[in-house]
């Protein structure tokens, strides 16, 4: 029976550490600031942004929310981002995705100053991650590495399989595992004999967006299984990309959904914002 990796508990520990560090900085008259830009009225995005704001404030950071209408022009959005780039009280900038179709996400991400890009999506940060240089790492992949390390497992020398090749999770988490000296395979919808490939993994990260996709025949006994999915099953109940009840028997460690990867994402955003502030102050 697999041991449950408690993402809530780990996220709380990391957030407490960030909060303590912010309190020390505030005593010196320095307060890290995070600005979130929300375009339109997507309810899921709105809920997510509210959570980010709440957690930012709990950590003692300055929190700014800029709301723009669905029909805002690309030019206007880019000028808002440029103003935030210049704002000395803001150290992290996040434009909530997805954006309306008439706006180029790529252009917006490229406009965010890479030293304030706490989402880790700017090409400079992506490039730094791939050459192993210190950079802002996308929040979910950064959280996944912390979850794996929390099991006490040494990543070096392990076989890792990542199912999913998105730019937001799959590719960066594969690169982070490689940077930790794991032997990494990226699998995806075109991979032949996927269960066999997955079964070789000491560490299996699943980010397919398909409810309960991974069954126990994908699992090497004792493997660490990280489920990035956030899906609904046939009864409309929240579940992951891994069939938890089936897989928990085989796994050594497994993240639940909810309560696994999810709580880590906002926590790593706060850690990135603190890192950005410290870097900017050091440069100045």
Curated annotation (Swiss-Prot):
Binding site for NADP(+): 164-166, 189
GO-annotated biological processes: L-histidine biosynthetic process; methionine biosynthetic process; purine nucleotide biosynthetic process; tetrahydrofolate interconversion
Lineage top rank: taxon: Bacteria
UniProt cross-references to CDD domains, sorted A to Z: NAD_bind_m-THF_DH_Cyclohyd
Pathway: One-carbon metabolism; tetrahydrofolate interconversion
PROSITE patterns cross-referenced by the UniProt entry: THF_DHG_CYH_1, THF_DHG_CYH_2
Catalytic reaction(s) noted: (6R)-5,10-methylene-5,6,7,8-tetrahydrofolate + NADP(+) = (6R)-5,10-methenyltetrahydrofolate + NADPH; (6R)-5,10-methenyltetrahydrofolate + H2O = (6R)-10-formyltetrahydrofolate + H(+)
GO MF terms held by the record: methenyltetrahydrofolate cyclohydrolase activity; methylenetetrahydrofolate dehydrogenase (NADP+) activity
GO CC field: cytosol
Spans traversing the lipid bilayer: none
InterPro entries per record: Aminoacid_DH-like_N_sf, NAD(P)-bd_dom_sf, THF_DH/CycHdrlase, THF_DH/CycHdrlase_cat_dom, THF_DH/CycHdrlase_CS, THF_DH/CycHdrlase_NAD-bd_dom
EC number: 1.5.1.5, 3.5.4.9
A family per Pfam: THF_DHG_CYH
UniProt keywords, alphabetically: Amino-acid biosynthesis, Histidine biosynthesis, Hydrolase, Methionine biosynthesis, Multifunctional enzyme, NADP, One-carbon metabolism, Oxidoreductase, Purine biosynthesis
Record-stated family: Belongs to the tetrahydrofolate dehydrogenase/cyclohydrolase family.
NCBIfam families for this protein: PRK10792.1, PRK14170.1, PRK14186.1, PRK14188.1
HAMAP family registered for this protein in UniProt: THF_DHG_CYH (MF_01576)
Subunit relationships: Homodimer.
Protein function: Catalyzes the oxidation of 5,10-methylenetetrahydrofolate to 5,10-methenyltetrahydrofolate and then the hydrolysis of 5,10-methenyltetrahydrofolate to 10-formyltetrahydrofolate.
Protein name (Swiss-Prot/TrEMBL): Bifunctional protein FolD
The organism of origin for this protein: Listeria monocytogenes serovar 1/2a (strain ATCC BAA-679 / EGD-e)
Gene name of the record: folD
